[in-house]
Structure formats: structure tokens, C-alpha cells
């Protein structure tokens, strides 16, 4: 069990990023009143200064994508990744060059380029990574 690649709650609590994680997870999960009880339990367990929503979050795909990217960046940092590692995971060609035989999120990348004109996930995760000042 000690070798499983998972973070335990104590690691998150002492990471300095617990608040950022909890606030974003609350906003991603609480989008209707079905989870009112869950949010109340969360509110009871969290310090008062945590910025938890007062009402379910209105679904906004753009904002949700940013919160998800911020969580991806935080967890990549907590797993000990460096910028080049994260770039490789998001898009091996970005590190190895065109023709790299490794693929990670090819379907996501192709869909986003086709639908959005860019690999948005990669851009947002790396923007969040830089915003938090990881690996600097």
C-alpha cells in the first residue's frame, strides 16, 4: 500500500493547497440541490475562511474547465512533477518533437483542436501551473 501512487488526506492537509483543492472541488461538485447535505458536511469540516459557495454553482463549462485545470496543476505538483514532466504527460510531442511514438491524451487533443482550434486542456493546465508558481 505504501507504494501506491495516491495522495493520502494528510498529505493534502499539509501540502499548503488544501484550501485551493477543497474550494474548487466544492464548486465542481455542487451544481444542484441534490448535494446540499454533502456541502453542509464539508462546511462543518472546513475552516471558516474557506470560500465555499452559498448556493449551487450554475453550470458554466468554461469556468469548470479552468477549475479542473487548476486541480490538475495542483495534483501534478503534489505528485512531484516538474514542468517538463507535466508537458510530456499532456503532450509527449511537446517534449520529444514531432513523430514521438508515445501518446497520452491523443483523443482529447484531437477533439479540442477540431472543436476549439487549440489543445485547450494543455494550455489551461500549464497556465494554472505557472499561476501557482510551480517548478519556478
Show where each model-derived region lies:
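S-adenosyl-L-methionine
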Residues: 1-136
